[in-house]
Amino acid sequence: MTRVRVRGIYATALTQLLRNAGLDVVAASPPIRARFPDADLGAAEPHADIRMTPDRQGVGITAHGDDHARAVRAVVADLPRDTFVWPDPVPRGAVFDAAVDHTVGGGAILDLGDDREAYLPFGAVDDHVTDGDTLRVAIRDPAPPWHDDRPTATSTITVSGALASLDRGVDALVAGAATDRAELARATELLDPDIPDNWGVYWEYDGADASLDARGTALDTLAARADRLEATLADADGGDTPGLVAAPDTTLWAWFGRETRCALDDHRRTVAATMPGHHRIKAGSDAASDAVDFAEALGASVDEFPFGAVTDQFGPSVGASIEIQHGKPDGALISLGRGEVTDRSAENARITVEREMTGGGTYDALGVAREAGDTATTRFTEGNWWYPTVYRSEDGERKGTYLNVCTPVEVFPDAVRYVDLHVDVIKHADGAVEIVDREELQDCVADGLVSEELAEKALSVAERVQSAVAE
């Protein structure tokens, strides 16, 4: 049975979903334990960790073993069609032989081989490093594919757990974040774990509340993982060529779309009061997340996602600058720049964004010159599977309209987000209308990046939009 620990704004919904799928949820936070009073969610070492990404858009999953990774992935991938799941080529806990490509303020950029990079803070390595140095590192914090950040590396090799972790090359047997270190030190001596030589115990906060038996089981599990990693490292000669040495864990990233957040609302609603748009609002900002908790605690009731109230309170408002974050099915995210919100309709859940374009090249698929002074006027409607952008010259002449087909649009306080589905509808200045890039969508299906169901939806939307704008 796969044991999973879950943290973040999606924890309640995912706990319900995972348990319904037959997986065990362990080391749950106090609020989660309170919402599942009849479930055994106590302290235990998980096979997989699910954590909300820093931007709240999805979750990162790190699993110890392929079977456990597949079990968790199957549950997450079964969410609605605008969920995307990608493997990470630089997973948490992986060990690399690396070369310093160059240094920047506060750290070094590492070449890990095979077009992989990581950031090494100077404080995460004992020795001074400079361009061209080679060293062995472990990945401490992997990075979602839609982020610009590189994964963060450290010179300390760690076997991470929920109750405790083991650090290689640490002199002290017991250290940690937990406050009662003296009691944990006594417990460790009593348990007398068979920790590999040159590895030290680091107790996590969850370890302080665990029973002695749970602590002992956790240390035995971690020691076995450390033994396997130590054997792999012993067989790997450190060399000057960057490359992967060991990947004991698998890291996956899941991007949640609007349909998925609504489905997670439904799962959460089976165990706790959940307003419409609960996860959608919480994904916007810390302040918005706190407001949802407050409203639900008061028993506030609304019939649908309150677009007007949310944008009134948290933005975007007319005159605000907002970024267009254009996700891709392979996990990349492209910024289409920032624009000014020129109109907002609470009734229609819509904003209008205007951007001034720079000169150079042509507009994709329209085949007309992109000139300085051109404007792009885009209408984003919350929940729509497409949005239109009208391009005009400096004197107001229409150059064409690009109707982008995408996963349901989400208008967050600082950005509009969606995943582009490649197929689009083009309306030329002379009124001619065509669907473009069908082949790119089919290539994504063939590569396993887009499901057949999602591709059929995208083509259906494109055909419907084509018919509407051709009239």
UniProtKB/Swiss-Prot annotation:
For this protein, the record's InterPro entries field holds: DUF402 (IPR007295), FomD-like_sf (IPR035930), Ntdp-like (IPR050212), RNA-bd_FAU-1 (IPR016730)
Read off the Pfam families from this record: DUF402
Molecular function terms from GO: mRNA 3'-UTR AU-rich region binding; RNA endonuclease activity, producing 5'-phosphomonoesters
The keyword Transmembrane is annotated on this UniProt entry:
no
Q: Ranges for the S1 motif domain?
A: 93-139
Q: Which domain of life is it from?
A: Archaea
**Transmembrane helix among keywords:** no
| Enzyme class of the recorded protein, top EC level | hydrolase
E.C. no = 3.1.26.-
Q: Which residues form the signal peptide?
A: none
Which UniProt key words apply to this protein?
Endonuclease, Hydrolase, Nuclease, RNA-binding, rRNA processing
Q: Which GO terms describe its biological process?
A: rRNA processing
Q: What is the similarity comment for this entry?
A: Belongs to the FAU-1 family.
* Function noted in UniProt: Probable RNase involved in rRNA stability through maturation and/or degradation of precursor rRNAs. Binds to RNA in loop regions with AU-rich sequences.
Name this protein carries in UniProt: Probable ribonuclease FAU-1
Q: What is the lineage of its organism?
A: Archaea, Methanobacteriati, Methanobacteriota, Stenosarchaea group, Halobacteria
